[in-house]
């Protein structure tokens, strides 16, 4: 296997002094042995409110550098926040490129009718790492016809 496909050492910078003091608790971590996503926490000093239908940008207090163009990180909503409280990501999915080195910021959108409160170091999102395929393109005049060919949305029906 090619080296770039097996290198999964991600560099992390701790930007929040409280995280530095207790990094084993505040760093991204898997909640259970079977978890796919690493929990990301709100690096805030005091409780903040997120009014109904509003969007807010919340810092995590960390920065990562993936440094491998064949790996990317996806920031996803936490299922409980979305289902129970109507809190999802403002951009639906966050894409962290391998060369990005800035602080991870979480765009939270309150789609509920109620004010939502975020406490310091609440788990607000999750992050997964996925492999990336970087294709090359070949310019052609025509495609070899398939059964589907150019049929678009809904072409196969619902049953």
Swiss-Prot record:
According to its UniProt entry, the protein's GO biological process terms are: dUMP biosynthetic process; dUTP catabolic process
| Enzyme class (EC, first level) | hydrolase
Pathway listed for it is: Pyrimidine metabolism; dUMP biosynthesis; dUMP from dCTP (dUTP route): step 2/2
Its EC number(s): 3.6.1.23
Reactions catalysed, semicolon-separated, are: dUTP + H2O = dUMP + diphosphate + H(+)
Cofactor(s) recorded for this entry are:
Mg(2+)
Q: GO molecular-function annotation terms? A: dUTP diphosphatase activity; magnesium ion binding
Family annotation (InterPro entries)? dUTPase, dUTPase-like, dUTPase-like_sf, dUTPase_trimeric
**Keyword Ubl conjugation recorded:** no
Pfam families hit by this protein: dUTPase
Family, per the entry?
Belongs to the dUTPase family.
The protein's job, in short, is: This enzyme is involved in nucleotide metabolism: it produces dUMP, the immediate precursor of thymidine nucleotides and it decreases the intracellular concentration of dUTP so that uracil cannot be incorporated into DNA.
Q: What is this protein called?
A: Deoxyuridine 5'-triphosphate nucleotidohydrolase
């Amino acid at each position: 296997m090619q080296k770039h496909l097996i290198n999964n050492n991600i560099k992390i910078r701790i930007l929040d002094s409280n995280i530095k003091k207790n990094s084993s608790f505040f760093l991204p971590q898997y909640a259970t042995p079977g978890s796919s996503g690493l929990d990301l926490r709100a690096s805030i000093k005091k409780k903040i409110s997120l009014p109904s239908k509003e969007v807010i940008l919340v810092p995590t207090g960390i920065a990562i550098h993936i440094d491998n163009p064949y790996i990317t990180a996806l920031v996803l909503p936490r299922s409980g926040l979305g289902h129970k409280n109507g809190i999802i990501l403002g951009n639906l999915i966050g894409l962290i490129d391998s060369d990005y080195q800035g602080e991870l910021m979480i765009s939270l959108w309150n789609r509920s009718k109620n004010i939502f409160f975020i406490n310091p170091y609440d788990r607000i999102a999750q992050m997964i790492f996925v492999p990336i395929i970087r294709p090359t393109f070949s310019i052609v005049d025509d495609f070899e016809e398939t059964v589907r060919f150019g049929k678009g949305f809904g072409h196969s029906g619902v049953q």
